[in-house]
């Protein structure tokens, strides 16, 4: 057993060495990958709408990729790039400095990164009318892409396929999963759809907004007056949502965040133990000052495409991929993606999750302890609104502590699971769980995909 383990480790180091030697000697970022380990392409999902995907085949030294699951990663925003942020900042084989990531998911799954909705990352549209404006369009576009992908890559049709997501990507993942389940049942898409994981997901926006005040107050980041102000604007958001005024609710959501920033001395919405970074020059423009929506875009999209990542994607990566149109820059259309979805932001998707549970689809909810924008209190709140018949039995269970190492005594997370619903409480993590707690995120992925 020990000899087998050592052989696996040696093979892993050889794979890693060959991966790194693929870089040219003259430039640490101009590399050539081993044949067959990566593929990428565009799919025209609608007229004037072109979606980009990038696949990494699993590199486990002891198993063939066909023995491991395929994981599709969906970023948030909307407008955040999976091929960029998800890949180089969270779970891909390399970081933005092109150094190996110790907690990459690639040893345990093949990874499919998709820039979605259209206009995100390297995906692009030819006309402004082609941007997606709602969840239905997002899901429909993804069905076109997935059909094309599985038709062209039949080697993955029988491999367990999971969708993992983050933030607004979770809302999109839920809608996509419902349509994918239908397509698989109807035989229009051939794949072994095995489950969806919703990470710090914007499933019920109003439950998140309503929980911000109590959460911040409990963490000593609001006083009584601040709590009253935040609670007041949260009630306005609730009223707008109840009346179906979703665009108005989005504007009020933006105002709520401004009130929180003022009262907390600039708390970071993605990790409450850090401060927000200084905002850039464009924020002083008249457009910015009069538009809460532009401010939302600044906060929730631009942090997903920092300078280092943008330079990497628009430089060495674009050169490597070779198929990106010359006039397309990574992330250039992200703001338009975000603004086009204005009417969809505050719509709840609890009923979508209920459909998945009723269909028997495995649903995992996971959340970072230090996240504010989608805090755990809000997640727990919408879960309790599910109409799933087994919810009472789920609630009766006691959670189980998880550790990243069997020898460790430090609790890394808690989990509760019953039938096809699981909930993970990830400790010491903010909104981007794999970035903050890479080892625990990897362990969770292995648990969800039944590898532990």
Curated annotation (Swiss-Prot):
Top-level taxonomic group: Eukaryota
Annotated protein name in UniProt: Retinoid-inducible serine carboxypeptidase
Protein family: Belongs to the peptidase S10 family.
GO MF entry, a single one: serine-type carboxypeptidase activity
Task performed by this protein: May be involved in vascular wall and kidney homeostasis.
Positions glycosylated per UniProt: 64, 102, 126, 192, 362
Compartment(s) of residence: Secreted
Main location: secreted
Signal peptide positions (record): 1-28
Enzyme class of the recorded protein, top EC level: hydrolase
Record-listed E.C. numbers: 3.4.16.-
Keywords assigned: Carboxypeptidase, Glycoprotein, Hydrolase, Protease, Secreted, Signal
GO biological process: blood vessel diameter maintenance; negative regulation of blood pressure; proteolysis
Database matches in PANTHER family: RETINOID-INDUCIBLE SERINE CARBOXYPEPTIDASE (PTHR11802:SF3), SERINE PROTEASE FAMILY S10 SERINE CARBOXYPEPTIDASE (PTHR11802)
Active site: 167, 371, 431
């Amino acid at each position: 057993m020990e000899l087998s383990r050592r052989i696996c480790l040696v093979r892993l180091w050889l794979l890693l060495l060959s991966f790194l030697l693929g870089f040219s000697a003259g430039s640490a970022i101009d590399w050539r990958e081993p044949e067959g380990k990566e593929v990428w392409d565009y799919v025209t999902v609608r007229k004037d709408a072109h979606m980009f995907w990038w696949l990494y085949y699993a590199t486990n030294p002891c198993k063939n990729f066909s023995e491991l699951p395929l994981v599709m990663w969906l970023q948030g925003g909307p407008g955040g790039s999976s091929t960029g942020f998800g890949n180089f900042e969270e779970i891909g084989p390399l970081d933005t400095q092109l150094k190996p990531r110790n907690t990459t998911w690639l040893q345990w799954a093949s990874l499919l990164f998709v820039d979605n909705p259209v206009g995100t990352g390297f995906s692009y549209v030819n006309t402004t009318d082609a941007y997606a404006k709602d969840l239905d369009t997002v899901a429909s576009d993804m069905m076109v892409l997935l059909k094309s992908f599985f038709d062209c890559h039949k080697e993955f049709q029988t491999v367990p396929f999971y969708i993992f997501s983050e933030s607004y990507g979770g809302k999109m993942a839920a809608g996509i999963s419902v349509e994918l389940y239908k397509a698989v049942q109807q035989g229009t898409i051939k794949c072994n759809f095995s489950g969806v994981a919703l990470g710090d997901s914007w499933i019920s926006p109003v439950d998140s907004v309503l929980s911000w005040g109590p959460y911040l107050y409990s963490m000593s980041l609001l006083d009584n007056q601040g709590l009253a102000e935040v609670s007041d604007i949260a009630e306005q958001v609730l009223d707008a949502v109840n009346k179906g005024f979703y665009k108005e609710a989005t504007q009020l959501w933006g105002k709520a965040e401004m009130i929180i920033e003022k009262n907390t001395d600039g708390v970071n919405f993605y990790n409450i133990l850090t401060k927000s970074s200084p905002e850039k020059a464009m924020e002083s423009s008249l457009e910015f000052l009069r538009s809460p929506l532009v401010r939302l875009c600044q906060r929730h999209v631009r942090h997903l495409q920092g300078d280092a990542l943008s330079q990497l994607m628009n430089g060495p990566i674009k050169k490597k991929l070779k198929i990106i149109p010359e006039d397309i820059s990574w992330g250039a259309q992200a703001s338009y993606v975000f603004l086009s979805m204005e009417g969809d932001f505050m719509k709840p998707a609890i009923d979508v999750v209920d459909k998945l549970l009723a269909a028997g689809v495995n649903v995992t909810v996971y959340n970072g302890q230090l996240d504010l924008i989608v805090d755990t209190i809000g997640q727990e709140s919408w879960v309790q609104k599910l109409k799933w018949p087994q919810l009472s039995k789920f609630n009766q269970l006691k959670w189980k502590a998880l550790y990243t190492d069997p020898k460790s005594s430090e609790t890394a997370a808690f989990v509760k699971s019953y039938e096809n619903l699981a909930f993970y409480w990830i400790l010491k993590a903010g909104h981007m769980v794999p970035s903050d707690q890479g080892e625990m995120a990897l362990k969770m992925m292995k648990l969800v995909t039944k590898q532990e």
